[in-house]
A protein has these predicted regions:
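Short, structured helix-loop element that forms part of the nucleotide-activated donor/catalytic region
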Residues: 41-45, 220, 225-253, 257, ...
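Conserved acidic donor-binding segment of nucleotide-sugar-dependent glycosyltransferases
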Residues: 309-311, 315-322, 331-337
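Short hydrophobic beta-strand element within catalytic cores of glycosyltransferases
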Residues: 295-298, 308
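Aromatic "clamp/platform" in nucleotide-sugar-dependent glycosyltransferases that forms part
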Residues: 259, 278
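Membrane-proximal helix-turn-helix segments that form the acceptor-binding/catalytic region
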Residues: 23-25, 71-74, 128-147
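Donor nucleotide-sugar binding/catalytic pocket of nucleotide-sugar-dependent glycosyltransferases
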Residues: 52, 134-185, 197
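Conserved donor-binding/catalytic core segment of Leloir-type glycosyltransferases
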Residues: 187-205, 210-214, 226-229
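A short, well-ordered alpha-helix in the C-terminal region of glycosyltransferases
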Residues: 324, 331, 338-353, 359-365
């Protein structure tokens, strides 16, 4: 029985973004393992997935601690002897890629779901950090039997050029997919319009611009509600503070809902989806909104623009521009026929490009090819 080991930095993220892939592997007779920090979820036992607890901090930068993570992964790989290691998010694919090289893992999948703050931010410190990270990235992406999955073409072009990754290693898979049965198309609700933001409450998700746009629209005398669906991420330096979030609750047109599992239900009660992020891999919340038939307003940045068809399923606005964001939202508020047209087109896009069955099938094809190459 072939073994596949997933390495991710958050078990809840794995459950929300990769579980269908793992389930398909199990159904096909693979032995599937997950290594991650955080809680072991009940669903893992229910589906027959083996869980390995990692000591991994998403944001820690202590050199000794980071070296220990590589050693920890090396030990896990040598003890478990997986046929494929599939690593998702930055630290797993960086440190796991190095450990997999050391442990001579037969096949490696490195899933780049976004480049992170090191490649978003500017300034001397960030540029210096990139120089330090270059040899680690170079090593992590140098496995002879490896596939690197990107969610958008901007990220793939950047890393291919920066690291001289051979194009034969690269695959483009647009996001983690959406369950079209769970996220069904619905007509817009009647009554006061609702504009919904679904994401962690991080500055680089554009939450401040979303709140600012809500107040611009309120000052224009337009009575609509703005829903904020997501929690603080206090271990993340980009997280909004509790005090700032509390201040938003004073605005009459803003409703802080917090993290929710019933996103499909929330979209069914909404009219417009909005994510003014600074950069993404490919945001799951936007493809879920499309599946539900909601027009989207998002930023013209990598990942976000890949989740929509501009002026067909949604509208693109400049980054960090609350005025432009408010203008786009206001346009959709005032044009229900445009919202309906975009929502219908969004559902069609989700069915064509983002169906979970399509995404899972693309992963299975990658695994089969890697296993075949490992046996040569």
């Amino acid at each position: 029985m072939k073994k596949v080991l997933f390495v991710v930095n958050n078990s809840a993220f794995f459950a929300s973004h990769r579980l269908p892939v793992a389930q398909q592997l199990i159904e096909k007779g693979y032995e599937v393992h997950l290594a991650s920090p955080g809680a072991k979820l009940a669903i893992f036992d229910e589906m027959g997935l083996s869980y390995h607890k990692l000591k991994l901090s998403r944001k820690g930068m202590n050199p000794l601690s980071e070296i220990r993570i590589i050693w920890q992964l090396f030990k896990l790989f040598t003890d478990l002897q997986p046929d494929i290691v599939h690593m998702v998010t930055i630290k797993p694919y960086l440190y796991g890629g190095i450990a997999a090289k050391m442990a001579k893992v037969p096949a490696v999948v490195s899933a780049v779901s976004g480049l992170g703050v090191v490649f978003i931010a500017a300034g001397f410190k960030v540029k210096f950090l990139r120089v330090l990270l270059y040899p680690l990235y170079k090593l992590a992406f140098s496995h002879k039997n490896q596939v690197v999955i990107f969610q958008n073409s901007d990220d793939s072009v950047f890393l291919i050029n920066w690291l001289s990754i051979h194009p034969s290693k690269v695959r483009l898979i647009r996001g983690s997919g959406v369950n079209l049965t769970a996220y069904q198309y619905s007509i817009e609700p009647t009554g006061k319009l609702v504009i919904t933001f679904v994401a962690r409450l991080l500055a680089d998700k554009g939450i401040r611009e979303f709140i600012d746009a809500s107040q611009i629209i309120h000052s224009n005398g337009i009575e609509v509600d703005f829903w904020v669906v997501g929690d603080l991420d206090e271990g993340n330096p980009a997280s909004i503070t509790k005090e700032e979030m509390a201040s938003w609750k004073k605005f009459p047109n803003v409703k802080i809902i917090g993290f929710q599992n019933n996103v499909a239900d929330l979209y069914s009660k909404s009219n417009i989806a909005c994510l003014p992020s600074y950069r993404e891999g490919l945001p799951k919340s936007l493809i879920e909104a499309a599946a539900c038939g909601r027009a989207v307003v998002t930023t013209d940045v990598p990942g976000c623009r890949d989740a929509i068809e501009s002026n067909e399923t949604g509208m693109l606005v400049p980054i960090k521009n609350a005025v432009a964001l408010a203008d786009a939202i206001e346009y959709l508020i005032e044009n229900p026929d445009v919202r309906t047209r975009m929502g219908t087109a969004g559902r069609a896009l989700a069915e064509k490009e983002f169906a979970i069955e399509k995404i899972v099938a693309e992963h299975m094809k990658i695994y089969r090819k890697l296993l075949d190459q490992a046996e040569l």
